[in-house]
């Protein structure tokens, strides 16, 4: 069993923002692979389904970004999941818009959602880093990541490719995964 966590913030004011790209990708995986609708739990939304004969759980923490580790730890502990079977999808301002990197372990690089997860389960889980870039104007990074994509349609094809090919990452074939989405 694998757990795919999409990071973001709950609420309509955060929809289609840079910081919510994890939610957007997880929603697209859910739709592409015909999972059931998300169910609301205390501090997260969850659904499950099958991708290439493997059971997959998708969650969207609803505890706000800075507390994402709480629901992730609950699920990891309940299902006794190995960190090898956890993938966290998150925005990365250090990567250009549309660049993707797959990484296991490492630091949070200042990302508060990752800091929270690290504090609860450690940092040796998989990350799918989705580049959102940095502001080209005078806005602070915080204001930028909480702003909506100016041209979301430019990001949509990449999100769809990730959803379609996520099974390769879950199988450990990160090279094929990256080659098919870029």
Swiss-Prot record:
Site (Stabilizes the basic form of H active site to accept a proton) residue list: 91
UniProt xrefs under PROSITE patterns: PEPT_TRNA_HYDROL_2
Site keyed Discriminates between blocked and unblocked aminoacyl-tRNA: positions: 9
Cellular compartment(s): Cytoplasm
Gene Ontology biological process terms from the UniProt entry: protein quality control for misfolded or incompletely synthesized proteins; rescue of stalled ribosome
Positions annotated to bind tRNA: 14, 64, 66, 112
Keywords: Cytoplasm, Hydrolase, RNA-binding, tRNA-binding
Domain of life: Bacteria
Signal sequence coordinates: none
Active site: 19 (proton acceptor)
Catalysed reactions, semicolon-separated: an N-acyl-L-alpha-aminoacyl-tRNA + H2O = an N-acyl-L-amino acid + a tRNA + H(+)
A GO term from the CC aspect: cytoplasm
InterPro entries: Pept_tRNA_hydro, Pept_tRNA_hydro_CS, Pept_tRNA_hydro_sf
Alphabetical list of NCBIfam families matching this protein: pth (TIGR00447)
Role description: Hydrolyzes ribosome-free peptidyl-tRNAs (with 1 or more amino acids incorporated), which drop off the ribosome during protein synthesis, or as a result of ribosome stalling. Catalyzes the release of premature peptidyl moieties from peptidyl-tRNA molecules trapped in stalled 50S ribosomal subunits, and thus maintains levels of free tRNAs and 50S ribosomes.
Subunit structure: Monomer.
Similarity annotation: Belongs to the PTH family.
Protein name per Swiss-Prot or TrEMBL: Peptidyl-tRNA hydrolase
Species in which this protein is naturally found: Wolbachia pipientis wMel
